[in-house]
Every structure is written in structure tokens, then in C-alpha cells.
């Protein structure tokens, strides 16, 4: 099996750090959030451990223009999560993690709008599995592309936060950030 080379970088955003993994063409494969770079790197390596043909390399020096563009767009999205849906059209991505069902859940979440939340049970019903809200919750927990797949928008039926792979305080912050009115960004013109 041929090796697939992926690049990773840790970027700073105002409230945390993000570890981003792309291919050499800038397609997003993975994103994780947290305050400790060393923990982000260890977690990434564990998450990729089953993919023996994926070779993870840190970006040293300046990244190529495609990778740099993805990193910058992710940073903008992280600073203002109301831009997530816009970035779905601007950042190329590839799901390598997850089962077919998990990917269906993630795609459904990618169709939610900023400042909207959805409950696990409603998502399960939408997928034709009305009694599988826990399965949907587990799929959210298995998401490996933070923010881009907006699992922070998924809540319990009562509107409570039941968990978040990157921590409940971060989920609360993201939901709060999405409640602010969106202002047009001239730098976000579609390409």
C-alpha cells in the first residue's frame, strides 16, 4: 500500500489552539482543539495509529499556498464559528475516519446553520432511526474534524450539553460565539 503524506500544523486562535492536518493540496483531513500542543500531537498520533500508510509530518517553514490557504480559512472559521457553513464551500476536505453511519451524522450536522442547534433524537429521526439518539451522540463524539463538522451544535432533547470531544466549556463558548450577528468579511469571497 502506497504511503500518503499528510502535513500538520498548530495554529493559535484567541481562545485555544487548533491542530490541523491536510494533504499537500490543502484538503482538510483532521482538526483538533485544545490548549496544550503536546496533548494535541499525542492525540493526533493515537487517532491516526490504525492508518499505517498515512505519514504525518509537521509543517516546517512556510507551507505551500494551498495548505496555507486552508490553515488561514480554518483560523478565520475558528475565530468566528458563524463562518463554518461558508467554509464548507471553500475548504476542501476528506473523511477518512468514521463508519458510514457516523459520516451520515456528520453530513447532517454540516447542514445545520450557525446559531441553530439540533438534538440527537431529532437527528436520529431524520436518519430513519428514531430510537438511536445515543448512536448519534456517539457519532458526534467520534468526529475528528473539529468545528468544520459542527458537533458543538448537537444537544440533548432538553437542550442540555451532554459532552463534547474537546470539552464542554469550549462547546459552550462556540455556541455563544455563534449567537453574535454576522458581519460581512471582504476576505471571505468565494474562489
Swiss-Prot record:
GO terms for biological process: DNA repair; methylation. Its main location: nucleus. This is Methylated-DNA--protein-cysteine methyltransferase. DNA binds at residues 120, 134. Its EC number is 2.1.1.63. Belongs to the MGMT family. Involved in the cellular defense against the biological effects of O6-methylguanine (O6-MeG) and O4-methylthymine (O4-MeT) in DNA. Repairs the methylated nucleobase in DNA by stoichiometrically transferring the methyl group to a cysteine residue in the enzyme. This is a suicide reaction: the enzyme is irreversibly inactivated. The active site is at 151 (nucleophile). It is found in: Nucleus. This enzyme catalyzes only one turnover and therefore is not strictly catalytic. According to one definition, an enzyme is a biocatalyst that acts repeatedly and over many reaction cycles. InterPro entries: MethylDNA_cys_MeTrfase_DNA-bd, MethylDNA_cys_MeTrfase_DNAb, WH-like_DNA-bd_sf. It comes from the Eukaryota.
